[in-house]
Swiss-Prot record:
Functions as a calcium- and DAG-regulated nucleotide exchange factor specifically activating Rap through the exchange of bound GDP for GTP. May also activate other GTPases such as RRAS, RRAS2, NRAS, KRAS but not HRAS. Functions in aggregation of platelets and adhesion of T-lymphocytes and neutrophils probably through inside-out integrin activation. May function in the muscarinic acetylcholine receptor M1/CHRM1 signaling pathway. Belongs to the RASGRP family. It comes from Mus musculus (Mouse). One of its GO terms (molecular function) is calcium ion binding. One of its GO terms (biological process) is cellular response to calcium ion. It is found in: Cytoplasm, Cytosol; Cell membrane; Synapse, Synaptosome; Cell projection, Ruffle membrane. InterPro entries: C1-like_sf, EF-hand-dom_pair, EF_Hand_1_Ca_BS, EF_hand_dom, PE/DAG-bd, Ras-like_GEF, Ras-like_Gua-exchang_fac_N, Ras_GEF_dom_sf. This is RAS guanyl-releasing protein 2. It is a peripheral membrane protein. Keywords: Calcium, Cell membrane, Cell projection, Cytoplasm, Guanine-nucleotide releasing factor, Membrane, Metal-binding, Phosphoprotein, Repeat, Synapse, Synaptosome, Zinc, Zinc-finger.
Length: 608
C-alpha cells in the first residue's frame, strides 16, 4: 500500500483517490496495484461511480491550473486502468460512461491528444447479458420425467455440466449485486443473484427427487451412490458450491430418514459420503472448507453462501465510516471486504476445465426446473418408507452420516426484547382481526352467540364473563384488548401469535409476512409455520403479528348471520388458535409430520 495512507486509521475518499493517482508513474506503470484495484472495486460501497468520475474530472482540472502535466497524465492513466479492469461498469452505467466521454471530449477540445488517447471508452464491449435472467419454464412443463438425463450420464460428465450451468449463472453477478444483498439482507430488486440462489436450491432438490422417484430401496440406494460419486467428481473439479448443493440434497431429512434405503448403500460409499459432508460442514466457521479452498490452484468455485455470510458479518460488525460526518471511511473494513469480493471475482476470470454439450445442458436445465416444496418432498419420502415400517436389522446395514449444519444461520442476531408497546401492537392487530371476522352483525361488539363461534376456533379462551368486564352482555374491542394485555405476561407477550416454526428452504421467492421483503431459502433465513404455513425471516419472528390459523381446524360460519340480500350467502372460513392465558408454556402444540400440508402463497387470506 502507498506509504502516505494509513487505512487502519481511516482516510477520506479524496485522499484515497489522490493515492491511487500517485500510484502511477508517467508511463502508466502501477507501483501499488493492490491499492488501485481495491479502491476502484470498492468505491461504490461508499459513493456512486458517477460521483467518483466527477472527482476525477475535478482533479484533472485542478492539476491543469497548477500546470502539473505529470498529475494530468497520471489521472488519465487511472481512468484507463478503471475502464480496463471494470469495463462492465461503463457499459451498464450510462451516466458514468457519459461523464468519461465528457472528460475525453474536454481533452480533445484542449488539444491534449496524448492524454485523450489513453481514454478509450468507445471500445467497451456490451455486458447486457449479465443483466439478463433466464426465465423458468411454465408450470405445466414441470412434471416431465427427470431420468432422461440422469440414467445416461457418468458422474464426471454430470459434475461437469452442473459446474458449467452454475458457472454461467455466477458470471452474471456483479459487485452491485453483492452490495445490494448485504445492504438489504435479501434479494430485493436483485434478480441475478436470486436466480443463482434458485439454481443452487434446484440442484439440491433435484438430488432428492431423483432418489425418491425410485420405487424400491435398492434402486434408491443406487441413485444415492451415483450422487455421492458426482459429489466426489465435483470436489475434483474444485467446485465447492455445487458440491454443497449435492451434499445438502443427500443430507436432507427426506433422504436421511430412509433407513431401509441406506442399508443397501455400501460401507465404502458411506465413508466417502461422510468425508464429503465433513468438508462442507459449518463446524468451525467452515474451517475444513476454507483450508481446502486456500490450497486450490487454478479454477475453483467457492461456496457463495459462505462468503456472502462473511460479507454480512462484516457489514454488521464494522461501520463503513469512522466519523459521524461520514468523511473518513473505514479502511480496515474496506480491505477485508475487498479480500472476500476479490476471491469471488477471481472465479469469473478462470474458466472451468469442462466441455459442455448444449443438448445436455438444455435437458439438465429442464430437469432442474422443478417446483416441489419441503413438505411435498417429505410426504414422498413417507410414501417410500412409511414410519410404521421397521428398520432393517441386517448386520451389514449402514446408517447415513448425520445431517450437518451445512449452511447455518448467517449471523447470531440477538432476539429483540418485547416491550409493552410491541405487545400492545400485536394484540391490537389480533383483536381487530377477530372483530373483522367474527363480529357477524357488525355492531362493534362480540355477543354471547358470536363468542361461542369464536370459542370453536379459540379452544383455550377463558369464559365470556372474564372478558366482559362491565357485565353488559357483550365484549368491546377495549375489553378484549385489556384481557389479552393482562394475560400477555404469562405467555411472554406472544399470545395468539404462537407458531410452530421450522426452517424453510423455499425454491420460489416468498415474502416475509412482517417486513414484506423476500426470503431466500438457501441460507436458512426463512421460517415457515407447520400449522398455518405463514413465512417470515428469523429476525422477524418475534415481531410477527399474524395469528396462527391452523387449517385442519377451520370452522365454517355458513348461515350464522343474515344475508344482506337474498341472492348472496356468506361463507367464512377461519383457522385461528389461541393459547389459554393461564398456561405457563408458550410452546405451540406438537404437530405430527403427517399433518404438514403444502401451502400456496395466498392461503392466509380470509375468503368471504
Amino acid at each position: 500500500m502507498t506509504s502516505t495512507l494509513d487505512l487502519d486509521k481511516g482516510c477520506t475518499v479524496e485522499e484515497l483517490l489522490r493515492g491511487c493517482i500517485e500510484a502511477f508513474d508517467d508511463s502508466g506503470k502501477v507501483r501499488d496495484p493492490q491499492l488501485v484495484r481495491m479502491f476502484l472495486m470498492m468505491h461504490p460501497w461508499y459513493i456512486p461511480s458517477s460521483q467518483l468520475a466527477s472527482k476525477l474530472l475535478h482533479f484533472y482540472q485542478q492539476s491543469r491550473k497548477d500546470n502539473s502535466n505529470s498529475l494530468q497524465m497520471k489521472t488519465c492513466h487511472l481512468v484507463r486502468y478503471w475502464i480496463s479492469a471494470f469495463p462492465a461498469e461503463f457499459d451498464l452505467n450510462p451516466e458514468l460512461a457519459e461523464q468519461i466521454k465528457e472528460l475525453k471530449a474536454l481533452l480533445d477540445q484542449e488539444g491534449n491528444r496524448r492524454h485523450s488517447s489513453l481514454i478509450d471508452i468507445e471500445s467497451v464491449p456490451t455486458y447486457k447479458w449479465k443483466r439478463q435472467v433466464t426465465q423458468r419454464n411454465p408450470v405445466e412443463q414441470k412434471k416431465r420425467k427427470m431420468s432422461l438425463l440422469f440414467d445416461h450420464l457418468e458422474p464426471m460428465e454430470l459434475a461437469e455440466h452442473l459446474t458449467y450451468l452454475e458457472y454461467r449463472s455466477f458470471c452474471k453477478i456483479l459487485f452491485q449485486d453483492y452490495h445490494s444483498f448485504v445492504t438489504h439482507g435479501c434479494t430485493v430488486d436483485n434478480p441475478v443473484l436470486e436466480r443463482f440462489i434458485s439454481l443452487f436450491n434446484s440442484v439440491s432438490q433435484w438430488v432428492q427427487l431423483m432418489i425418491l422417484s425410485k420405487p424400491t430401496a435398492t434402486q434408491r440406494a443406487l441413485v444415492i451412490t451415483h450422487f455421492v460419486h458426482v459429489a466426489e467428481r465435483l470436489l475434483q473439479l474444485q467446485n465447492f458450491n455445487t458440491l454443497m448443493a449435492v451434499v445438502g440434497g443427500l443430507s436432507h431429512s427426506s433422504i436421511s430418514r430412509l433407513k431401509e434405503t441406506h442399508s443397501h448403500v455400501s460401507p465404502d460409499t458411506i465413508k466417502l459420503w461422510e468425508g464429503l459432508t465433513e468438508l462442507v460442514t459449518a463446524t468451525g466457521n467452515y474451517s475444513n472448507y476454507r483450508r481446502r479452498l486456500a490450497a486450490c490452484v487454478g479454477f475453483r468455485f467457492p461456496i457463495l453462501g459462505v462468503h456472502l455470510k462473511d460479507l454480512v458479518a462484516l457489514q454488521l460488525a464494522l461501520p463503513d465510516w469512522l466519523d459521524p460526518g461520514r468523511t473518513r471511511l473505514n479502511g480496515a473494513k474496506m480491505r477485508q471486504l475487498f479480500c472476500i469480493l476479490e476471491e469471488l471475482a477471481m472465479v469469473t476470470s478462470l474458466r472451468p476445465p469442462v466441455q459442455a454439450n448444449p443438448d445436455l445442458l438444455s435437458l439438465l436445465t429442464v430437469s432442474l426446473d422443478q417446483y416441489q416444496t419441503e413438505d411435498e418432498l417429505y410426504q414422498l419420502s413417507l410414501q417410500r418408507e412409511p414410519r410404521s415400517k421397521s428398520s432393517p436389522t441386517s448386520p451389514t446395514s449402514c446408517t447415513p452420516p448425520p445431517r450437518p449444519p451445512v449452511l447455518e444461520e448467517w449471523t447470531s442476531v440477538a432476539k429483540p426484547k418485547l416491550d409493552q408497546a410491541l405487545v400492545a401492537e400485536h394484540i391490537e392487530k389480533m383483536v381487530e382481526s377477530v372483530f373483522r371476522n367474527f363480529d357477524v352483525d357488525g355492531d362493534g361488539h362480540i355477543s354471547q352467540e358470536e363468542f361461542q363461534i369464536i370459542r370453536g376456533n379459540f379452544p383455550y379462551l377463558s369464559a365470556f364473563g372474564d372478558l366482559d368486564q362491565n357485565q353488559d352482555g357483550c365484549i368491546s374491542r377495549e375489553e378484549m384488548i385489556s384481557y389479552f394485555l393482562r394475560s400477555s405476561s404469562v405467555l411472554g407477550g406472544r399470545m395468539g401469535f404462537v407458531h410452530n416454526f421450522q426452517e424453510s428452504n423455499s425454491l420460489r421467492p416468498v415474502a416475509c409476512r412482517h417486513c414484506k421483503a423476500l426470503i431466500l431459502g438457501i441460507y436458512k433465513q426463512g421460517l415457515k409455520c407447520r400449522a398455518c404455513g405463514v413465512n417470515c425471516h428469523k429476525q422477524c419472528k418475534e415481531r410477527l403479528s399474524v395469528e396462527c390459523r391452523r387449517r385442519a381446524q377451520s370452522v365454517s360460519l355458513e348461515g350464522s348471520a343474515p344475508s344482506p340480500s337474498p341472492t348472496h350467502t356468506h361463507h367464512r372460513a377461519f383457522s385461528f388458535s389461541l393459547p389459554r392465558p393461564g398456561r405457563r408454556s408458550s410452546r405451540p402444540p406438537e404437530i405430527r409430520e403427517e399433518e404438514v400440508q403444502s401451502v400456496e402463497d395466498g392461503v392466509f387470506d380470509i375468503h368471504l
